[in-house]
A protein has these predicted regions:
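A short secondary-structure junction signal
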Residues: 145-146, 182-183, 210, 240-241
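Conserved nucleotide- and phosphate/pyrophosphate-binding catalytic cores
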Residues: 193, 199-391
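N-terminal Rossmann-like or analogous alpha/beta NTP/dinucleotide-binding catalytic cores
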Residues: 32-175, 293, 332-334, 342
């Protein structure tokens, strides 16, 4: 899974480029203004595997906070299966198998179907149609300049042969965001170019066809130190293929085994040796998960993480002691997630119904936007009697 798929933001007004010309051509009420008062979030993940603690720290925890903040009128959480197929077209079973796994991880983390609409991307065909119309507003060279696209192409070794669907996924993401009139999108800094491209598409569409689409604002994660957790082997990124992930669905024994095998400072060979906390995965994980109350419960000799770090850097503290503390901290954090997941695993029919109802609600919302888009473009032929007059 990938967090596409994570501050308080307000809806920003769009620049009215070519506004006078637009109003003369399309003398109608702004569809964007009709929806302006609502605060809406869209976010999601690609279902290419079970979600891990990196997803939890990077986006899921923040989503639950936003969901429970009461600041947003609507929250849409998308399982981006169509996007996952852009680089898994020959293995659709991989995507299919992980739809329920991602949904279970969502519910286990505390995402609430009463407060958020959880849906499957491919069950909302309006998104594909919007993508097709937006493609006409973006050049190939502009997509090629997108730093995120460049990085993703390189990561997947697509340089020699890029699937068209994969190449166009920034346009698809713009369709996802605008279809639900998202006013805010939680993203990591590495995804900022995607949001910028979405804003460009919104500006272009509104300048050509009149104010119709809503421009999203960006919500950056508040804990920037934990934007991306390293793998337990010290590699820069958690990866299923590298086997260096701690999954949200891991058992208590699995988590303990992985924590105790974690990479640490390679120069910290003896207890009395000074240790380095910078770039040390154990301390990066503690930065992400540890709270002051954990010390009172599990390590009362220390008041906070700074004290623990100081002792480790000074020498006289073994890695095993730090790892045992980290294991206690993570078990404390993951236990309620594990418990909720067990409940939903025993109620899979309910999970299926949540996805079905969520997808139906999402399609109804996207259909409204598509109707507005087609009206703005004057291609709503059977809803517009002016066609009969040759206008």
């Amino acid at each position: 899974g990938k967090s596409c798929s994570c501050g308080n933001q307000q809806t920003a007004g769009l620049a009215g480029v070519g506004r006078l010309h637009t109003v003369l051509r399309y003398p109608r009420r702004s569809e964007r203004d009709r929806h302006k008062s609502k605060k809406i979030i869209l976010t999601g993940d690609r279902p290419t595997g079970r979600l891990h603690v990196g997803h939890y720290v990077g986006s899921l925890k923040e989503r639950v906070r936003l969901q429970n903040s009461g600041q947003f009128d609507e929250i849409y959480i998308m399982i981006a299966d169509a996007q996952a197929l852009t680089d898994n077209a020959e293995h659709p079973e991989k995507v299919r198998q992980n739809i329920l796994q991602v949904a279970l991880d969502y519910l286990a983390c505390g995402l609430d179907p009463e407060k958020a609409t959880i849906f499957i991307q491919s069950m909302v065909p309006e998104l594909t149609e919007l993508t097709f119309y937006y493609m006409n507003l973006v050049t190939v060279s502009r997509v090629q300049r997108n730093p995120t696209v460049k990085a993703e192409i390189q990561m997947r070794n697509f340089e020699a042969s890029i699937p068209v669907g994969f190449f166009c996924y920034p346009i698809s993401q713009a369709a996802d965001i605008t279809a639900f009139r998202a006013t805010a999108v939680p993203v990591g800094e590495d995804k900022l170019p995607m949001l910028e491209q979405c804003k460009e598409i919104v500006h272009k569409f509104n300048s050509v066809y009149g104010d119709t689409l809503t421009e999203p604002e960006i919500i950056l994660p508040s804990n920037k130190a934990c934007l991306r957790l390293p793998g337990i082997d010290g590699k820069a990124k958690m990866s299923k293929s590298l086997g260096n992930c701690i999954y949200l669905s891991d058992t208590e024994a699995d988590v303990k085994k992985k924590v105790m095998s974690m990479f640490t400072d390679p120069n910290h060979l003896r207890v009395e040796d000074p240790g380095n906390v910078d770039g040390n995965p154990v301390f990066i994980y503690l930065d992400a998960f540890c709270r002051p109350e954990h010390f009172a419960e599990f390590l009362p000799d220390y008041q906070n993480l700074d004290e623990l770090k100081t002792h480790y850097q000074r020498g006289g503290m073994g890695d095993v002691k730090v790892k045992k503390f980290l294991n206690n901290v993570m078990q404390s954090e993951l236990a309620p997630i594990r418990e909720r997941r067990k409940y939903w695993e025993e109620h899979l029919t309910d999970v299926y119904d949540i996805l079905k109802k969520g997808s139906e609600a999402a399609e109804a919302k996207a259909a409204e936007t598509l109707k507005d888009v087609k009206a703005a473009m004057k291609i709503n032929y059977f809803d517009d009697s002016s066609l009969l007059k040759g206008e």
